[in-house]
Amino acid sequence: MVVTGSPPIPGTAAVTSAGLSAPRQSGRSFASAENAFSPITRFLAFALLSCVGLQALGLDFADETVTQTLCAALLLLGLPHGTFDWQLLHAGLQRSIYTFALRLGLYLGLAAATYLAWQIAPIAALTIFLLIAIFHFAEDWESDVILANSSATKPKFLALAMPISIITLPALSHQEMLRSIFVMLSGDESAVMLVDVMILLAPVATGVATAKIFMDCATGEISRGIAGICVLSAMVILPPIAGFSLYFCLYHSPLHFSTGWKQLTVDQAKYSALIVAGLTIGGLAIAALVYSFGQGSTVTGNLVATAFVTLSLLTVPHMIMPSLVSRRHSSL
């Protein structure tokens, strides 16, 4: 049987009376129509249908003006969800000023190293960014449901298949456009080889991702399943940047932002809005610097590079820092 009550936002676990996360038991019944979809999934589906309608009416989502707008949206709507990294820094400050300085230095060092990698070996930096993004996005699709007649949850590789499919599907549906984007990001024609690899991975990853979507729906996680359908559809129907923007801005970021906000204490929540706003402005300042040093031959090229390079500067420390801090014998 599926645990009754309002389901948690996808990617979060049910909470027991002891305040600890606990897996949810799956079954054959489905959630009610009223509770089947989270607000995030509903808005995602509405946005996808709207985009499909606008595209049918003649709007070109690959147009330069639209692309520039989408890149701005990636920064404005995408940056806030990563600003909860300040909690790690704040926790370090509570331990000692030395720990705080060490964490801050490591965070900035990782970001600086990432930027340096883009300058020295852009294709390698792009490849690493895509790999890190896959593991990061997999968090959106991890399940906490215990399979019926079993003590196990769904295999982790199913969650990993979703972001691999999301990232590689445009290689099948918009191959030449994706090639030009990768060349634009790296400044190297050899970057098209990444698209060739994606063409090989996409069918397998999408097949596994489709199986996961069916499994999610069959085990009562309809909201996550519908979100998966919407995101994969967007990556096929819309141009690469438009499809990715839809996923990143309307599903990934809200999901992580809401999860991070719920983890705050009452006292933290009082000043978190100001801190998040301040850090977002700081992120935009970094984006402005990246843009000012851009080597793109066009405004659109520079904006695309700025959006994705800036996201990589924040994603790398965002992914690496927690694991470093959580090490049992770490001085952090």
Residue ranges and their predicted role:
Residues 48-54, 106-115, 225-234:
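Hydrophobic, membrane-inserted alpha-helices
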Residues 91-101, 109-172, 183-189:
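Membrane-interface helix-loop-helix junctions at boundaries between adjacent transmembrane segments
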Residues 53-67, 293-298:
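Short, hydrophobic transmembrane alpha-helix segments
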Residues 139-145, 238, 247-264:
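Predominantly late transmembrane helices and immediately cytosolic-facing juxtamembrane segments
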Residues 185-199, 308:
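Short aromatic-rich membrane-water interface segments that cap or initiate transmembrane helices
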Residues 27-46:
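N-terminal membrane topogenic signal
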Residues 68-78, 124-135, 243-255, 307-311:
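Hydrophobic core segments of alpha-helical transmembrane domains in multi-pass membrane proteins
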Residues 131-135, 140, 156-178, 196-213, ...:
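Alpha-helical transmembrane segments of multi-pass integral membrane proteins
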